[in-house]
Amino acid sequence: MPKITMQQFQKNSYLADNNAGYIETLYENFLKDPHSVNEEWRSYFRTLTNGASTPDISHATIREEFRELARKPRSISPTAITPAAEQAAVDLLIEGYRRFGHLNAKINPLGDNRPVDSRLELGHYNLTESDFNKTFATYGLLNKPKATLKEIYTRLREIYCGSIGVQYSTISDERERNWLRDYVEQRLPSIEFDKETKRNILQQLVTAESLEKYLDTKYVGQVRYSLEGGDSLIPLLDELTKRARHQKIEEIVICMAHRGRVNVLLNIMGQSAAELFQEFEGKKDYGLMSGDVKYHRGYSRDVKTDAGPIHLSLAFNPSHLEFICPVAMGSVRARQERQNGHKRDYAMTVMIHGDASFSGEGIVMEALSMSQTRAHHVGGSIHIILNNQVGFTTSNPHDARSSMYCSDIAKMLDAPVFHVNGDDPEAVVAVTQLALDYRMAFHKDVFIDLVCYRRHGHQEVDDPMPTQPAMYKVIQEHPTTRTLYAKNLIEKKLCTAEEVDQWIDDYRDRLDRGRQLVETLPEGLSAHYAANWTPYLGQDWTTLVDTTLPLKKLKALGKKFSTLPNTLHLHRKVEAIYKARLEMAEGKTPMDWGFAEMLAYASLLEEGFSVRLVGQDSRRGTFFHRHAVVFDQETGKEYEPLKHLSDKQAAPHIYDSLLCEAGALGFEYGYSTADPNSLVIWEAQFGDFANVAQVIVDQFISSGWQKWNRLSGIVLFLPHGYEGKGPEHSSARLERYLQLCAQNNMQVCAPTTPSQIFHLLRRQVLRPYRKPLVVLTPKSVLRNKLAVSSLEDLARGQLKLLIPEIEKHDPKKITRVILCSGKVYYDLLAKRREHKGKLNHIAMIRIEQLYPFPYDELKAELEKYPNAKQVIWCQEEPKNQGAWFCTRHRLIKCMRDDQTLEYVGRSAFAAPAAGYSALYVKLQEQLVNQALEI
């Protein structure tokens, strides 16, 4: 094999799959003989283990030791084993505990009946208790270079088989693995909590338990999804919040499901008891909002810590478990980027999962896959699995998942997982410190599997005994975590039973008085954390705003982003596009869609509004029209024209996303809820695929304002249009978005000209109105010679909610008016022009905004044609799809009494479109001819 220099290897990405075998071979050779590899690699490999307390052992050596052990009979006399072989056996024992110790860790508060794993027994390595007094090298396992086997074995049992089970041995990064090993073996066992810390942990458990008991007696039978059994979550979050602030984190966004949410609201977030009681008693006034149940409510507040205040936000959450995860990540990314750049340690995501949903919901995998991508990384999230070992009525792991642990999906991230017994609150707090320190060191996700139980049924009124009799017999006899820990501290004389009783009484007294249970800052002092949404409250969609720009400015901006460095070696097609854009910028040729769209972005960036556009092919554009990022054909180097407009411009964030819809759209929605001053766009590769993200659309985008009073200006680009590409590449399912529209909750538009998309995008940001915008974007129309605009359309025009007839006809001679939306207009226009002068009795009106519907504009337009008795709605989509059913009553409302409304389009169809090209052409020609009476 030829020698490869380090520089060459890095250029080819030495972490790539096709290089993995080669680099592993080099590393194995290095471990056997450092001089067997060249100096560059030798130096590099040494940096991997620099500072590690234990040297790596090559896989070949370990395999050979196992072969040697297998060849020797078990009854071999200890005296016959050489000291080197004994040391190797001890090395394997240590490695075995690092890899498999978690299998016998005491992590289940209800008792663990797992058999002892043979790989954790001395005999597996040909060692016995008779070897206990022999001395071996420890390689940093203990605080001395050598120790007896008994000391080593005892230490291994204490570290790896106590209340904490650790999984980190499969992490591929040597530096991370060494860091975790040293932390687990050196720092974690040395953590000693002082008296005050232990008393604080107990006080946190008192608050967790006392709240649930108080609510259980005050609001009998009301559903609250009690935390009981998982009480250690409260000291965990308390420690996490305080330690995060000490490490300079200023904001934490927490997302969680319903279990324990009420407890977190009061005991961590600082919501007052009086506010919560209003929810229980149904006294909260939501006005015109629908509101939501108390265990879905979000909250935000500045909580005091001894290191300063920290802003905590608990994300609003639907019952659709885990879909909040990418939403919370997006919110954190926006908060980080608001700080004059992507500051990963300014804000952090804490995700609290259920064991059943974490291993069961596919959105979890999407969120994890996003965590290290350029478009979506947030510097690492803390994941807490509230593992109560049951999902509603399903407690058999063979039904709940196909893996040993509910956390096993985390292995895909090469991330550490810490399983911890919820009945050992000190271990819980210690693991919390470890998890946060790892996140801060490596900016990667980390997982805490908080193994606990659910004291009641799924709801407080639900009886779990019919389906989990054995488990709940144990739970009924099992003391609470607070009881166990209080007993422990009382026995150690760190507190008295009377003190504990007094803490409980004091807590209940504060609840009786409706007080806050956590010290927070007054709301007026916390404004610097939050984006200012005040200008957007109470605004109407009809608010007018000037979206034009002076012609001179338009030309200058167009020239800036269309002029690329001469050093770039462009693809010939891309070069032609940018050459054409320069001519458009000069006004020599009409502009196409791609130019107008880029011009809209450039203008907003120059005015100080950042632009974030993310989708599976968004940098180039699925249909090769955008090219917001261009690539040097010789070096592969990227160049983003929109980053080079001016020194004071805002930042563009244009990324290709990973191949997912729900997670990616959820992320962008979350981003948009935390930054009203950015144009945030998620683009589907084809509109057809957006229904993979239907939960995000249904539970967040369309209803977030109504349920939670949450504004969002997110934009959805959904390529839509019937062009013979079959049922999976034709329809964005327009009908579904229109069906969701009510109370001006969002906007649905189908712009058909470049000037329309320019004004539409600028309106979305410049107008003091923040509601989601669904845009049916074109495909073939991107290059349709009829779909062009001039610079004057941008300098003097505005967004038209509908576009009237564009050709000159005598209004009195018009007897038939065709109303349509989207690409079908150009099919109608082309066909009408084929029949020159023969169809002058037909006028065509494009409705560009389908919701909120432009009643006044359409009514005024129809009034222009006094003799038009026939009004036609023409659409490409089947009759049971498209805009027809959701729009016809609106059309009728705008018509005169002497007018009739007819439908022209495809018949009702189970599939969105025909799969056969010939059938598509036939049906398309039929509907166009029928609309034009040909």
Swiss-Prot record:
* Keyword Oxidoreductase found: yes
Cofactor(s) this protein cannot do without? thiamine diphosphate
- First-tier enzyme category under EC: oxidoreductase
UniProt-listed GO biological process terms: glycolytic process; tricarboxylic acid cycle
Recorded catalytic activity of this chain's protein: N(6)-[(R)-lipoyl]-L-lysyl-[protein] + 2-oxoglutarate + H(+) = N(6)-[(R)-S(8)-succinyldihydrolipoyl]-L-lysyl-[protein] + CO2
Q: Which domain of life is it from?
A: Bacteria
Query: Per UniProt, which keywords does this protein have?
Result: Glycolysis, Oxidoreductase, Thiamine pyrophosphate
Q: What does this protein do?
A: E1 component of the 2-oxoglutarate dehydrogenase (OGDH) complex which catalyzes the decarboxylation of 2-oxoglutarate, the first step in the conversion of 2-oxoglutarate to succinyl-CoA and CO(2).
Q: How does it assemble?
A: Homodimer. Part of the 2-oxoglutarate dehydrogenase (OGDH) complex composed of E1 (2-oxoglutarate dehydrogenase), E2 (dihydrolipoamide succinyltransferase) and E3 (dihydrolipoamide dehydrogenase); the complex contains multiple copies of the three enzymatic components (E1, E2 and E3).
Name the chain's protein: 2-oxoglutarate dehydrogenase E1 component
Origin species: Coxiella burnetii (strain RSA 493 / Nine Mile phase I)
Gene (name only): sucA
